[in-house]
């Protein structure tokens, strides 16, 4: 394997774009904190971090295999390894299988409930790319897939999926719909031409209002989570910071339109980090005060 092929595999796995990994990782780590009622065991952190990174790459490969014919018509994607012929579909399938086995080996260190849930996670990862052909809001399926680690984190630690896990899961789904709608704006004109469905297409001229709506639905659910878990005021301070971020972004969208959508999408990982930090500090305060 030469240097050019290695680079092509690297690009296929999207390792040059770590932001989506962080968008999945922060909610998963936050779920580990919530499930542990504090800092989780280091083994869980290692297993879930590896799992997130590997399954993100698996999702990217599946997406590129499914979209190889569509990607040829989109300026942003027509140079991807499969579309440009740098790698074959066969190469991609073997890499996908290998990485899936790595992820499954990681999950074998967890309980049976979590192992069973991992098959649901894989199903969602496979389903998402094909939803763009028939489902008006494929971002909903992406939200289900991206944030399924929340359920797996709770099942690994508590061997159950309690109410707070569901609240947090739905909150992150709303957040995912919002930020991936921003991302989809970059391809909206191409999607309209080739018949690909997305929330950016569905919401039309009111897309920025819907982005703000889903952002604030996620914040409302975080407030409900805080009330349910009896969190202190510090948690709500973090929610306020997130709301200011969303309002700021809304006016940036209105001003700059789709020219800033990729940067706006990338900035969302800070929201995940803020929620993770306030969850950690929340339990530290509970522990020592």
Curated annotation (Swiss-Prot):
Lineage top rank: taxon: Bacteria
Root EC class: transferase
Pfam families xrefs: UbiA
EC number: 2.5.1.39
Catalytic activities: all-trans-octaprenyl diphosphate + 4-hydroxybenzoate = 4-hydroxy-3-(all-trans-octaprenyl)benzoate + diphosphate
Entries under PROSITE patterns matching the protein: UBIA
Essential cofactor(s): Mg(2+)
Keyword annotations: Cell inner membrane, Cell membrane, Magnesium, Membrane, Transferase, Transmembrane, Transmembrane helix, Ubiquinone biosynthesis
Transmembrane spans: 19-39, 42-62, 85-105, 107-127, 134-154, 165-185, 211-231, 233-253, 265-285
Annotated pathway: Cofactor biosynthesis; ubiquinone biosynthesis
PANTHER family: 4-HYDROXYBENZOATE POLYPRENYLTRANSFERASE, MITOCHONDRIAL, PRENYLTRANSFERASES
NCBIfam families: ubiA_proteo
Protein name per the record: 4-hydroxybenzoate octaprenyltransferase
Organism of provenance: Francisella tularensis subsp. tularensis (strain WY96-3418)
